[in-house]
UniProtKB/Swiss-Prot annotation:
Subcellular location, record wording: Mitochondrion inner membrane
Pfam families to which the protein is assigned, alphabetical: Cytochrom_B_C, Cytochrome_B
Lineage per the UniProt record: Eukaryota, Metazoa, Chordata, Craniata, Vertebrata
Family note: Belongs to the cytochrome b family.
Organism of origin: Halichoerus grypus
Gene: MT-CYB
Cofactor binding note: Binds 2 heme b groups non-covalently.
Name of the protein in its database record: Cytochrome b
Length: 379
């Protein structure tokens, strides 16, 4: 009798993607983040669904509906904090996943990489809109500041901003629209993730050595399913500790003040996972220039495959590139710190230097380092 797992049209797809998938035998824990991102996405969709059952997207009741969820709904507080901190875990996994791709040269799978960039933009848009929904001070002013950036677009900017606002300021129409998009986009992300996997399985996974290991592959199950379960348990452990012991650690206290259009908070800043991009935005005095730098800080990933000058794929055997990579990581951490600081003397200069260094490493230093490494090896 033939195995249903290998013959049934639906089971066959699952089997070829998660069970009998030939996988390199040497992939490290850095390859765990794909499955962790899947878990985060499912968790966010489920907790979000239960929150949406009690949330009202109206400016007069949005803030109190979130309070109602935390106080009156059975286990509403844990659902709310799982959703809020789940977003933080999502972005930690995302940045690790992208960092892994940069380090090991996974960007040479251009289709997979480009879908990944689209996914990153979509998730960032979803998270931004989700932050607006509790309708606290930082929600309102964050929405005002970020949507207002579109007014820097020549000719159509002002009309575009008013179209997104649904009026002449951030108000009821904006909140309702953001809720609608925040609800639908995770399902778009789910579909894009399936396409991301589809393209990945066309080529097979990369591995730390960067060499195509067709002669040495093992089935995904049980070897990597058990490894992914360990990663998932660690993720759940960290998330649980965060939710149960310090749920507001990564949030902003200002968001516990209901939105007031007449009172601006002293420091308007986004959630921690956007601070690096926010620092790049603020480091350019010109509005349009800042917006372009903000978009390019992520879009620059799309040209990384074109700037790959090394004869080797990953950085495993390239010490100069490794140093530059970790300098880039340190630079991004510096930008994250700067993004959360007020616009004052030392911070402005540090932010500008860190922004220049960010683009310099990716556009100039890494390609040059690769050429130097090729010459050292006489390739």
């Amino acid at each position: 009798m033939t195995n249903i797992r290998k013959t049934h049209p639906l089971m066959k797809i699952i089997n070829n993607s998660f069970i009998d998938l030939p996988t390199p035998s040497n992939i490290s824990a850095w390859w765990n983040f794909g499955s962790l991102l899947g878990i985060c996405l499912i968790l966010q969709i489920l907790t979000g669904l239960f929150l949406a059952m009690h949330y009202t997207s109206d400016t007069t009741t949005a803030f109190s509906s979130v309070t109602h969820i935390c106080r009156d709904v059975n286990y509403g507080w844990i659902i709310r904090y799982l959703h809020a901190n789940g977003a933080s875990m999502f972005f930690i996994c995302l940045y690790m996943h992208v960092g892994r791709g940069l380090y090991y040269g996974s960007y040479t799978f251009t289709e997979t990489w480009n879908i990944g960039i689209i996914l990153l933009f979509t998730i960032m848009a979803t998270a931004f809109m989700g932050y607006v929904l509790p309708w606290g001070q930082m929600s309102f002013w964050g929405a005002t500041v970020i949507t207002n950036l579109l007014s820097a677009i020549p000719y159509i900017g002002t009309d575009l901003v008013q179209w997104i606002w649904g009026g002449f300021s951030v108000d009821k129409a904006t909140l309702t629209g953001f809720f609608a998009f925040h609800f639908i986009l995770p399902f778009v992300v789910l579909a894009l993730a399936a396409v991301h996997l589809l393209f990945l399985h066309e080529t097979g996974s990369n591995n730390p050595s960067g060499i195509m290991p067709d002669s040495d592959k093992i089935p995904f199950h049980p070897y990597y399913t058990i490894k992914d379960i360990l990663g998932a348990l660690l993720l759940i452990l960290v998330l649980t500790l965060l939710v149960l012991f310090s749920p507001d650690l990564l949030g902003d206290p200002d968001n516990y003040i209901p939105a007031n259009p007449l009172s601006t908070p002293p420091h308007i800043k986004p959630e921690w996972y956007f601070l690096f991009a926010y620092a790049i935005l603020r480091s350019i005095p010109n509005k349009l220039g800042g917006v372009l730098a903000l978009v390019l800080s992520i879009l620059i990933l799309a040209i990384v495959p074109l700037l790959h000058t090394s004869k080797q794929r990953g950085m495993m055997f390239r010490p100069i590139s490794q140093c530059l990579f970790w300098l880039l990581v340190a630079d991004l951490l510096t930008l994250t710190w700067i993004g959360g600081q007020p616009v004052e003397h030392p911070y402005i200069t540090i932010g500008q230097l860190a922004s220049i260094l960010y683009f310099m490493i990716l556009l100039v230093l890494m390609p040059i380092a690769s050429i130097i490494e090729n010459n050292i090896l006489k390739w």
